Amino acid sequence: MDKLLERFLNYVSLDTQSKAGVRQVPSTEGQWKLLHLLKEQLEEMGLINVTLSEKGTLMATLPANVPGDIPAIGFISHVDTSPDCSGKNVNPQIVENYRGGDIALGIGDEVLSPVMFPVLHQLLGQTLITTDGKTLLGADDKAGIAEIMTALAVLQQKNIPHGDIRVAFTPDEEVGKGAKHFDVDAFDARWAYTVDGGGVGELEFENFNAASVNIKIVGNNVHPGTAKGVMVNALSLAARIHAEVPADESPEMTEGYEGFYHLASMKGTVERADMHYIIRDFDRKQFEARKRKMMEIAKKVGKGLHPDCYIELVIEDSYYNMREKVVEHPHILDIAQQAMRDCDIEPELKPIRGGTDGAQLSFMGLPCPNLFTGGYNYHGKHEFVTLEGMEKAVQVIVRIAELTAQRK
C-alpha cells in the first residue's frame, strides 16, 4: 500500500484532460503519455499480453497462479479527466488527520467546506487529498488506476490465489468515446468491474439512459427599425423552446432515480442559434418519452415560420442503462458485495447519475458494474479523495480476485 499514494500523485501530475468534438481517439496527446507510462509499469511488473491499441486502449494480463477452470475477470479505469475543468499543473494538497471545518484550497479564497459538502463530517481523522483550488484533482479516474495497479502488486507480492486477471485502461471516457473502440474479444474476460465510482461502499450497476439533442435554429435578421413582420429572431425562438422544457426536471432539481433535461449550451445571434441539451432517465420508456417531448417542443415553436426560417433537431442516443445486462449475471454483484463485507465495508447499491465505460461494455457482451474509488466532487476544483478510501478499494479488488478463484 505504501506506493498507492505515490502512484496516484504521479498519475495526476500528467494533464490528460479529454476534448469533446474531436474525431481522433484519444482526443488529446496527454492521454498517450499516461498510457505509455502505464504500459511501461505493467511490463516492469511482469504482466503478460501487454498491448496498446492505435485507439489508446491499454490491456494486460496477470496470469493465474492456481490451476483449474477459474473465470477470467477484468478491472478497468479511464486515463482522461473531464473537459469541464482544467487538469493542467495539478497541485495536490495532502491533509492528514482531517479534524473538521473548512480546508483552504491553495492561497486564494477557495475552500472545501462541510457546509457545502456534508460528507466531510464522515471523514474525520482521515487523510484527504485535495486540489489547490485552481484545477480538478483527477481522482476521476486516476484514483481507480492507482488502485488497480496497487492491487496487482499486492496479488503478486502476497501470492494471493487468483485466476487470470485482465486489466484495461481506456481513453476519452469523459467524452463518451472510450468504450467504442474496446475489443471485448481481445480482453477475453467473463465479466469485469470499472473502478470509477465515488465514496467507499458504492457499487453501481444502474446508470442513465442518455441522449444528446442538438437544435439548430435559423432566423432572419433585418434592421430592428424596419423589422415588423420580417425579422425572425433565432434567439427568441431558442428562449421559447427552453421555456417549454419542464423547469422542475433539470439536473439541479432532481436526484436519485429522477431523470432530467439539461440545457448544456446555447449560443447565437438573431440570424442563427444553436442549443445543446442532454437527456437522462433510468427508465427506458420515460427516456423515449423525453425524446418525443423535445421533438414536440421543436415542432410547436417552429410552427408557422417562413420557409427560409426553420428549427432542425437531431437526437443521438449516447448509452443505455446497463441494469438489464448486469442482472442477468447476479453472481457478479454477489461477489463484489461479499468482497466489501469481507473488508468491513457495507455495500451501498446506488444508481449512477451519469455513465461509465461499463455501461457501453455491458451492451457489448462484457457485464461490467462499477466499484468505488474513494473520491468525491468530481469534475471540479472541490474534488478530493481519501487515502483510506483508496486503500479500501485496493482491498476490495484483491478480495474480488480471491473470491473468484474459489468459484471453480
From Swiss-Prot:
Instruction: Name one process (GO BP) from the record.
Output: proteolysis
Give residues annotated as binding Zn(2+) 1: 78, 140, 196
Record SUPFAM superfamilies? Bacterial exopeptidase dimerisation domain, Zn-dependent exopeptidases
- What InterPro entries does the annotation carry? ArgE/DapE_CS (IPR001261), Bact_exopeptidase_dim_dom (IPR036264), Peptidase_M20 (IPR002933), Peptidase_M20_dimer (IPR011650), Peptidase_M20B (IPR010161)
Q: Metal-binding: present as a keyword of the record? A: yes
This entry's comment on the bound cofactor is: Binds 2 Zn(2+) ions per subunit.
Catalytic machinery residues: 80, 173 (proton acceptor)
Summarize where Zn(2+) 2 binds, as residue positions: 140, 174, 379
Protein name, UniProt field: Peptidase T
Subcellular location, in the record's words?
Answer: Cytoplasm
> What family name appears in the similarity comment?
Belongs to the peptidase M20B family.
Which keywords fit this entry according to its UniProt record? Answer: Aminopeptidase, Cytoplasm, Hydrolase, Metal-binding, Metalloprotease, Protease, Zinc
Q: Which GO terms describe its cellular component?
A: cytosol
Q: What is its main location?
A: cytoplasm
Q: Which NCBIfam families match?
A: peptidase-T (TIGR01882), PRK05469.1 (NF003976), PRK13381.1 (NF009920)
Record-linked HAMAP family: Aminopeptidase_M20
What cofactor requirement does the entry state?
Zn(2+)
**According to the UniProt entry, what is the EC number of this protein?**
3.4.11.4
The UniProt entry, under Pfam families, shows: M20_dimer, Peptidase_M20
Which top-level enzyme class is recorded in the Swiss-Prot or TrEMBL entry? hydrolase
What the protein does comes down to:
Cleaves the N-terminal amino acid of tripeptides.
Which reaction is the catalytic activity of this chain? Release of the N-terminal residue from a tripeptide
From the UniProt record, which GO molecular function terms apply? metallopeptidase activity; tripeptide aminopeptidase activity; zinc ion binding
